[in-house]
Amino acid sequence: MFDTKQTLDAFDPEIWQSIQDEAQRQEEHIELIASENYTSPMVMEAQGTKLTNKYAEGYPGKRYYGGCEYVDKAEALAIERAKTLFGADYANVQPHSGSQANSAVYAALCSPGDTVLGMSLAHGGHLTHGASVSFSGKMYNAVQYGINPDTGLVDYEEIANLAREHKPKMIVAGFSAYSQVLDWQKFRDIADEVGAYLMVDMAHVAGLVAAGVYPSPVQIADVTTSTTHKTLRGPRGGIILAKANPEIEKKLNSAVFPGGQGGPLMHVIAAKAISFKEAMTDEYKAYQKQVVANAKAMAATFNERGIKIVSGGTENHLMLVDLIGKEYTGKDADAALGAAYITVNKNAVPNDPRSPFVTSGLRVGTPAVTTRGFKEKQCIDLTNWICDVLESLENGNSEQVIADVKAKVLAVCAEFPVYK
């Protein structure tokens, strides 16, 4: 029998302290990593429930273990809410992550050795879109497309030519570092021309899609995948969506279980259901509109300060800051901003002369600061502070500038707490 009066801080003070330190970091640092966000207390509450105790291999109504009648209800709610939220005919809410969702789609629609056409990691794609170090580049014949280095935009003619040349079994559309709107229909047309499946990975923009501020790929692609965190602001996990196709739906279910996973995480699935319900509210739609407005304000301010943005601006939640030609690297900028309590991530940019571990760019995103309550004014101020730090790296006065900016960050974070 468990003693429910026993406390974590008393039993395991080391882990407790790590949790408290991270909570303090989240409150006192400005989070600009484009893939990060703060989830709601209700989502976190669900993840800490007794649902974590239940094994539920299989799907609702078709489990391998007994005692699943209540977790069946939770998963059925998550499935129906996901379908309603995204206008999908099919949803699988069991993938533990976005990468595992993508892996399941590859397994369902392709065979090892098949050709897959995806966006290069160096140009803004994801590891699972064919990178050589990923399963997608090791198990499949990965052909990579990129962006036009002059415009910073996806080159659809290049994609069409590569598709005609290599005849891929599947084309992957989506990104982890691209600031413009992808034309899902153009990808569909290219896929149809060469007889390929079209998979869209909308992990970065799923929240924007749910709110109607970014075009939906769900009824255009054969299969759409996403994480449930990032802009969607739910728990860490994955999801697979599709338009009606019984044959593909059966393959997808089998690829997730038993093909790639065993028991689903029922406490996380319940949290996913909560986040989908949150995403149906008017407040959530207003939040996503503000995410884009804040990103546009930041991009415009970078441009005004003479800091180049790849593609010139943004139409979503993120932007790539191009530091090619600067005396400092993306790694240097990342570290300096981190010392000022501004968290970003170094990122490769098109034609980057530096290694992926050093880079000549930064990726910046607004989902987390918008959750804090930042509007355009705070984001403009923040961008100016970032530019001050970057300029100080060239002017030799970075120590004082970083200290000044850190003080401003602490003040604005106190004014806009994450969790009241």
Swiss-Prot record:
This protein's pathway: One-carbon metabolism; tetrahydrofolate interconversion; Amino-acid biosynthesis; glycine biosynthesis; glycine from L-serine: step 1/1
Pfam families, sorted: SHMT
A single GO molecular function term of this UniProt record: pyridoxal phosphate binding
GO BP: any one term: glycine biosynthetic process from serine
Cytoplasm listed as a keyword: yes
Subcellular location(s) per record: Cytoplasm
Modification N6-(pyridoxal phosphate)lysine, positions: 230
CDD domains named in the record: SHMT (cd00378)
Keywords, alphabetical: Amino-acid biosynthesis, Cytoplasm, One-carbon metabolism, Pyridoxal phosphate, Transferase
Catalytic activity: (6R)-5,10-methylene-5,6,7,8-tetrahydrofolate + glycine + H2O = (6S)-5,6,7,8-tetrahydrofolate + L-serine
HAMAP family found in the cross-reference section: SHMT (MF_00051)
Name the record gives this protein: Serine hydroxymethyltransferase
Gene name of this polypeptide: glyA
